Amino acid sequence: MDDNKRPLYLPFAGPAILEAPLINKGSAFTEEERIFFNLEGLLPHVIETIEEQASRAYDQYKNFGNDLDRHIYLRNIQDTNETLYYRLLQNHITEMMPIIYTPTVGLACERFSKNYRRNRGLFISYPNKDRIDDILNNSTRQKVKIIVVTDGERILGLGDQGIGGMGIPIGKLSLYTSCGGISPAYTLPITLDVGTDNPHLLEDPMYMGWRNQRIGGEEYAEFVEAFMEAVHRRWPDALIQFEDFAQKNAMPLLERYKDRYCCFNDDIQGTAAVTVGSLLAACQAADSKLSQQRIAFLGAGSAGCGIAEAIIAQMVSEGISDEQARQQVFMVDRWGLLQDNMPNLLPFQQNLAQQVAKVEGWNTESENISLLDVMHNGKPTVLIGVSGAPGLFSEEIIKAMHTHCERPIIFPLSNPTSRVEATPKDILHWTKGQALVATGSPFEPVVIEEQTYEIAQCNNSYIFPGIGLGVLASGAKRVSNEMLMASSRALAECSPLAKDGEGSLLPALEDIHSVSKHIAFAVGKVAIEQGHALPASDELLMQAIEDNFWTAEYRRYKRTSF
């Protein structure tokens, strides 16, 4: 128990205190607290420490036979005793992150309605569009500072999961707390229930969402506008993270709101920031610059294009022109290499399309320039997969890349594991252990000829908790591109590979607290420099980060009257 902090004064007692996850201590209530809060007889006699509770919980956790059951068990602890939940994650973060988030959370989303047990967060349904203010006021969390919101249309690589997508905001906010030290009392997951186009859900008698085809067009835009305005009225200083919106909505929503509210899209900007940070670390280890690389993408959706734009911005900051940087980036989708004469390019793709004149002399084997054609002609040194389609990084493609690049950098980032473009084991075997590999989902280390290769997980959890902490500590009113670039550079500075040629590309998850604080400082400093936050010295900013960093310790309680 943290005796250095002042006690919390609570106006209620008895079973009510045991049913409030944010304040429940279970068997850790002291004898004095049990008397004052009318808890005598409601708990077993023994008074435990949080570590004793966590030890029992971990023993129970290990007895479950599959990851989904482990996920459900951990969620039950979260809905019963949040402090214990986060102590358990703190003690076993590497083991449990794949359980509370990707890849297991994908299965939890698919089975959300079937496994539903208890409310968490807010569901705002389109039929209730005129009562959004009332719905927000129904939240028991009064000081919300970070919101993760989804409409469930593009959940990981699984597509439309309707309200089942709520598993993503819940899981994401668990990482804000366990990795970034954001108090769970300041977090709120929200799902915008605008219907679903998933026929399996519409026909499922257990589906708990609004049974209707998804709304779109002006109806959708007006609903999201009403939501954003209502959130700003209720919690004007809250950071809003857009999560798993479909491509057709993700970028337009970000463009519409990024200069009006404190918000960002993790799929576009968070993924870009962690990818750029990982690339910077890889380049530092090779004593080169990102601006010297030639980069091929498989997948030209909003996430892939967001990463590409962030890479180009970093290249330009290193001294090359925007035009030159764009010539070094090759975007490939199902129709082949994006070229500026293609019809129906989306707005965010147009500036990333290669000029036809630059590639018309290429020796190609297909009418549309394929990824393999790009390997032979463009000779990329970096390959990034955000296609959501498994197995597309074939042996032929990887070996073609390796013929012109001794140490290729290969990031198959698609989630969940079942959607990855190639496994690290295959990539390392095909390149004889020479590739630098990072993935979007967790993979076991690979052993080749008695050498073990740790596989870095290029996971947004390295970035967004630090961004959230930096925004909260500095009081930033916006999330700018420069703040995101600062987060990438800060992550690269934490890379073990930069200090040791045999080290991992990304830090160990056990070091995530120090990484998040380092990123938070970089983000907050840029926010202050840009005028998005009030002036503060480096010392004051660092102190604010420490003051806002929540740890999973019980507080002392005192009783007060209503």
From Swiss-Prot:
Cofactor binding, note field: Divalent metal cations. Prefers magnesium or manganese.
Leading EC class: oxidoreductase
Family statement: Belongs to the malic enzymes family.
SMART domains: malic (SM01274), Malic_M (SM00919)
Record's protein name: NAD-dependent malic enzyme
GO molecular function per UniProt: malate dehydrogenase (decarboxylating) (NAD+) activity; metal ion binding; NAD binding; oxaloacetate decarboxylase activity
Gene coding for it: maeA
Alphabetized HAMAP family for the sequence: NAD_malic_enz
Catalytic activity: (S)-malate + NAD(+) = pyruvate + CO2 + NADH; oxaloacetate + H(+) = pyruvate + CO2
GO cellular component, one term: cytosol
EC number: 1.1.1.38
Keywords: Metal-binding, NAD, Oxidoreductase
InterPro entries given in the database record: Aminoacid_DH-like_N_sf, Malic_enzyme_CS, Malic_N_dom, Malic_N_dom_sf, Malic_NAD-bd, Malic_OxRdtase, NAD(P)-bd_dom_sf, NAD_malic_enz_proteobac
Site (Important for activity): D267
Cofactor(s) listed in the protein's UniProt record: Mg(2+); Mn(2+)
Enzyme active site: Y101, K172
Keyword NAD part of the UniProt annotation: yes
